[in-house]
Structures are given as C-alpha cells and as structure tokens.
C-alpha cells in the first residue's frame, strides 16, 4: 500500500467534508473545493479523519490512493490556511501593479501586459517588483503563477524577467573573443 495513502487526513474544526457518490467536497473559511472521486479508491470518513484504501490490489489503485489522499489534504489545507506563490521581477523598469482582479505588468514590451485573475485567486503587489498570488486551490495558484512567469521568463545571460522568489537562475558566461 502507498506510504502516503496509508496516512489519514485530519479534518480540523470548521471544515466540512462531504463524500458523495463520485465527488468529494470540502468547505471551510477559505471557500469550497470539489474533487471527482476515482473509482480505484475507496474513501471512508470516521471521527474527524478521512482514510483512503485502494479498491483492488493493482499498482494503479495503490498509486491512486496516495494521489487522492494528497489532493484531499491540499483541499483541506487550502480552505483553512490557503496557498500563496511569490514572484519577483528583475530588470530595469520592470514593475507590476495589482488593480482589483487584474495584474498590470510592464516588463520590457512596447505595451503593458494585463492579466485577468480567475475566480478564487487574489493578487497583491507589496512592492512594484514583487507579486503575491493567493488562493485556496493549490493547482490553480501554481497555474496562474506559471502563466505570469511565462509572460517574461528569466533569460540566462543577465537574469532579467519574472521568476519565482525561491528560484535560482544560473547565469551563463558570454562568448569570449
């Protein structure tokens, strides 16, 4: 059995988890999230915890039990604490400005780039060169951060561009004459 799939998911107070036919819903202070249940995994709830068992002895069911467990755990953490990703802008004149549900980027193009935020995602700019993306859905927060980074990825010679705050850019040496 999967090592991660063996561990139960603790459900804290203030979080409601409903396991219906083929859907798991988690509701809390941070919102509500839904996940389609996989047929290879049996989900059972007991005394403030959720446990996941493979439906059969196949490798796929074993692997999927760990995957389902972690996805539901991310949902529980998301509706209680939430997730955030930080991005930094490196470059002369590069700046970001949050305007409600929009992000306005000036990153070296001849025009400003506007990015709309999906529902459930908030964006903040504590400084003009820093972007903080927050939300309850871990996958969506990471996806939005990756889309913003793709607007101007860091280039390898000077390191200019949009990067994750914990990302290390290896700077290449220029060609010697």
UniProtKB/Swiss-Prot annotation:
Coiled coil: none annotated. This is Large ribosomal subunit protein uL6. One of its GO terms (cellular component) is cytosolic large ribosomal subunit. GO terms for molecular function: rRNA binding; structural constituent of ribosome. Part of the 50S ribosomal subunit. The lineage of its organism: Bacteria, Pseudomonadati, Pseudomonadota, Betaproteobacteria, Burkholderiales. Pfam families: Ribosomal_L6. InterPro entries: Ribosomal_uL6-like, Ribosomal_uL6-like_a/b-dom_sf, Ribosomal_uL6_a/b-dom, Ribosomal_uL6_bac-type, Ribosomal_uL6_CS.
């Amino acid at each position: 059995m999967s090592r991660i799939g063996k561990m139960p998911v603790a459900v804290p107070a203030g979080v409601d988890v409903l396991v219906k036919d083929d859907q798991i819903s988690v509701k809390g202070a941070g919102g509500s999230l839904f996940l389609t249940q996989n047929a290879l995994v049996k989900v059972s709830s007991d005394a403030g915890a959720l446990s996941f068992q493979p439906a059969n002895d196949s490798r796929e069911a074993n692997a999927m039990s760990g995957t389902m467990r972690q996805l539901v755990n991310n949902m529980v953490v998301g509706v209680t604490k939430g997730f955030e990703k930080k991005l930094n802008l490196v470059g002369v004149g590069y700046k970001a400005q949050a305007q409600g549900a929009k992000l306005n980027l000036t990153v070296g193009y001849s025009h400003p780039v506007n990015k709309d935020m999906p529902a459930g995602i908030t964006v903040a700019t504590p400084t003009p060169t820093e972007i903080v993306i927050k939300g309850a859905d871990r996958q969506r927060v990471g996806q939005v951060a990756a889309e913003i980074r793709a607007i101007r990825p860091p280039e390898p010679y000077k390191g200019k561009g949009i990067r994750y705050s914990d990302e290390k850019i290896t700077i290449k040496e220029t060609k010697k004459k």
